Regions:
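Hydrophobic beta-strand residues in large extracellular and virion-surface proteins
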Residues: 80-82, 87-89, 128-132, 141, ...
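Generic detection of short hydrophobic beta-strand segments and adjacent strand-loop junctions
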Residues: 2-7, 96-98, 139-141
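Conserved beta-hairpin
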Residues: 61-105
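Terminal and domain-flanking low-complexity segments
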Residues: 1, 131-219
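N-terminal membrane-targeting/pre-transmembrane regions
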Residues: 1-46, 188-195, 199, 205-208, ...
């Protein structure tokens, strides 16, 4: 069995990383103030601003280090388990299992990340998403891919190109089909995020079990 950890950048982790940054700013500022007092004298006027700006920037490596440690030590509790003929989404309190030997409906789509100010996912990256439905069971999985990763993925698997309403360009395989808009809302509400490499493993697993998975973005 292969287990793919989901939602590694969960809300609790991001809050903890932000808190570590704030603590780092405070500690660096106080240490800087102590050193300044010993070397120059009391911190006044522009010195306060200089120390504050320096503390903000110097605390960023501390926050990144803390986030890296938390990624290892604090999983979200969600994971995708890949077994021969099966796919399981393990939640904190329950699990959802799909039998890949039976009929599974799926929809695959992607869209470009645009107009973001800061954040973990840069503008120009892509969200690649997949919704699997079997009876009353549904699973939404996704990953954020760089442009190079996106090109490599669509070379193997076609994805519906979900476009903004203001985008007038015509796409051979894309637009704003209602079923994909609905699937995107479900992804936003309850989807599980995977790392790009794990998303590739997921696609390969499904391609090995579902007929025509590599040929069409939906079934």
């Amino acid at each position: 069995m292969t287990e793919l950890h989901a939602d590694r950048y969960h809300g609790g982790l991001r809050i903890a990383a932000l808190a570590s940054w704030a603590v780092g700013v405070a500690i660096i500022y106080l240490l800087g103030q102590l050193i300044w007092n010993l070397v120059v004298g009391p911190v006044v006027g522009s010195g306060i601003l200089v120390l504050g700006v320096a503390a903000v920037f110097l605390a960023q490596p501390l926050a990144l280090w803390a986030e890296k440690q938390l990624l290892t030590l604090w999983p979200s509790g969600r994971a995708v388990q890949l077994e021969t003929g099966k796919l399981t989404l393990r939640e904190k309190s329950a699990s959802v299992r799909l039998d890949l030997g039976q009929k599974v409906n799926y929809w695959r789509w992607r869209f470009e990340v645009r107009n973001r100010r800061g954040g973990r996912v840069p503008n120009g990256h892509f969200c690649f998403a997949l919704r699997l439905v079997q009876g009353d069971t549904a699973v939404s999985l996704y990953a954020f891919l760089s442009p190079d990763q996106a090109r490599a993925t669509v070379a193997r698997y076609p994805f519906y190109d979900l476009r903004p309403s203001a985008d007038k360009n015509k796409a051979t395989l894309g637009g704003r089909d209602a079923i994909y808009l609905s699937a995107e809302r479900e992804r936003w509400d309850s989807g599980a995020e995977l790392d790009p490499s794990d998303f590739g493993r997921l696609l390969a697993h499904l391609g090995a079990h579902l007929p025509d998975f590599s040929a069409s973005p939906n079934s």
